[in-house]
A protein has these predicted regions:
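Accessory "access/gating" subregions that flank catalytic or transport cores
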Residues: 188-193, 197-212, 225-232, 243-259, ...
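Active-site-proximal beta-alpha loop/turn segments in soluble metabolic enzymes
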Residues: 177-188, 220-235, 264-270, 284-285, ...
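Short, hydrophobic beta-strand segments
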Residues: 115-121, 223-229, 275, 378
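Catalytic-core signal marking the mid-to-C-terminal active-site face
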Residues: 2-8, 15-20, 241, 248-249, ...
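Short glycine/proline-enriched loop/turn "hinge" motifs that connect secondary-structure elements
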Residues: 104-111, 149-150, 214-219, 266, ...
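Histidine-centered divalent-metal-coordination microenvironment in nucleic-acid enzymes
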Residues: 156-170, 216-228, 260-282
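ATP/Mg2+-dependent ligation/transfer catalytic cores
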Residues: 2-213, 235, 424-481
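A generic structural motif
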Residues: 39-41, 120-126, 189, 229-235, ...
Length: 481
């Protein structure tokens, strides 16, 4: 995995787990370990093992789980079209092998621990289509080049006063937002959300995830909690833990939260991804080499273009790769039908074109920071994105730019929504899926098995959507047609 050799406060090791398991009379005792595999939707799937069974057996042999976990849709419905696990194989087991670097107390359940796992075939070999494995393959490509990725995600969600059961009883419509109006950046009008949000923040901090900030966003009831950047795998694990924690703590509080990209006609939920590359020794690689007086040393190209000031050649090619691959990789950033409702919203901060800019929020690639903090912000992913696949896509696109020495076109200084000559993102999941399936770049970077597996997942999503009668159809046609 090439994860940095460090351990955050709040994480557990096996010796601590044994001690907590033995102290059965203590309120800090742990009696269960939840072993979770992130699925194609970025949800934790798996089983709870008694702590004794985990220590005595699961650590050595893993935990069996049905292979269909990586071949189902949002509804957990199986589909016959996956080469990975078709019906005629009988849907046998793979084994969930715990990644002990992720072991911690479950933030939503004080007597349980949780650990992330990788899927392995019984005969050996990691299941390549598992999202963690997809990201690991791209991290390995970085590692062979002497590189490592640091990442952070900014994930938004909506808070409602109703419970999940009440929301379901109302068909998830007509719900009461936890704030009555736009309180973006406001310190007024957020008290209705503060109780649940504070509980989530504290629980995540106790689980070893450093909280940097939290604030309300544009949509009524919308909030964003920002955690400190980390190595790319840890950030994606923390992202999934955050979503899982938020949903469980909301349910315990009798409330509901949603991370769906576009709940209604208001602002959608984004998941902006910040990413930079470092050397394996921690050296800064995105910033140009400084002169003795601290100014960045320009090369011939950056000396002629002010928009490139401070960016290393490696960073420029990395950003150019984002632009070159963005349309073909859109499926990794926007994996559902609903994703494209967010990206199609006029007048929102969700990008529609393929461009980059300096601190320009109308561009899908926003270059921010300076020196060691110089990084890209990828603004296409929504709250429904699988973080492992999104970050893997950003890395693969960047490596395509670096390996092919791509030149970076001029930055967009104005409104990228209306700028002439700006290519557009796919407008629908169908368009994105076709571009992904036919992408030679994707097949070279990820392998045919991964490309075909994710393309079929989009097929299943589209088949469900295209055969579902919606409220929109009934409202328009029931009486008037």
């Amino acid at each position: 995995l090439n994860r940095p050799a460090r351990r955050h406060p709040g994480l557990l090791d096996v010796d601590e787990l044994r001690r907590l398991a033995a102290s059965t009379r203590s309120p800090d005792s742990i009696d269960e370990v939840l072993v979770g595999l992130p699925d194609l939707q970025g949800r934790l799937q798996g089983s709870g093992a008694s702590v004794d069974h985990f220590i005595e057996d699961v650590l050595a042999r893993g935990l069996p789980a049905c292979a269909y976990l990586l071949a189902v849709d949002v509804e957990m419905d199986t589909d016959a079209g996956y080469a990975f696990a078709p019906w005629d194989t009988g849907f046998g087991d793979f084994r969930l092998v715990p990644d002990l670097a992720t072991l911690r107390r479950a933030p939503w359940h004080p007597r349980s621990a949780v650990v992330f796992a990788d899927a392995w075939w019984p005969a050996g070999g990691m299941v390549r289509v598992a999202p963690r494995a997809v990201l690991r393959a791209q991290l390995d490509r970085l590692y062979t080049r002497g590189l490592a990725a640091l990442a952070g995600t900014e994930l938004e969600f909506l808070v409602f006063t109703e419970s999940y059961q009440q929301a379901a009883d109302r068909s998830y419509g007509g719900l009461t937002s936890a704030s009555r109006y736009n309180v973006d950046y406001s310190l007024i009008g957020t008290s209705e959300m503060d109780g649940l949000v504070r509980t989530i923040r504290r629980a995540m901090a106790d689980a070893g995830v450093r909280v940097e900030s939290a604030r309300a966003e544009v949509h009524p009831g919308q909030y964003e909690i920002v955690f400190r950047y980390d190595d790319a795998m840890s950030t994606c694990d923390n992202h999934v833990l955050y979503k899982t924690t938020a949903k469980n703590l909301a349910a315990q509080a009798g409330q509901a939260v949603t991370f769906m990209a576009k709940y209604d006609q208001g602002e959608g939920n984004s998941c902006h991804v910040h990413l930079s590359l470092r050397g394996r020794d921690g050296a800064t690689l995105f910033a140009a080499e400084p002169l003795e007086d601290g100014r960045a040393a320009p090369d011939e190209e950056s000396a002629e273009r002010a928009d490139l000031a401070g960016m290393s050649k490696l960073m420029r090619s990395f950003v150019a790769g984002q632009l070159a691959c963005m349309a073909e990789f859109a499926l990794l950033f926007a994996p559902t039908v609903n994703s494209y409702k967010r990206l199609a919203a006029p007048g929102s901060f969700a990008p529609t074109g393929i461009a980059w800019g300096r601190d320009n929020r109308t561009c899908p690639v926003r270059v921010v920071g300076s020196g060691r903090s110089l990084r890209i912000e990828h603004r296409v992913p929504g709250g429904d994105a699988n973080p492992y696949l999104a970050v893997a896509g950003i890395i693969a696109a960047g490596l395509y730019g670096i390996d092919n020495d791509l030149a970076l076109p001029p930055a967009t200084a104005g409104n990228a929504f209306t700028a002439p000559g700006v290519a557009r993102l796919p407008r629908t999941l169908r368009q994105a899926q076709r571009l992904w399936r036919s992408s030679e770049i994707a097949r070279a970077a990820f392998g045919d098995d991964v490309v075909d597996h994710l393309a079929h997942a989009a097929d299943a999503e589209l088949a469900s959507y295209e055969t579902t009668v919606t409220d929109w159809e009934r409202r328009r046609a029931f009486e008037r047609l």
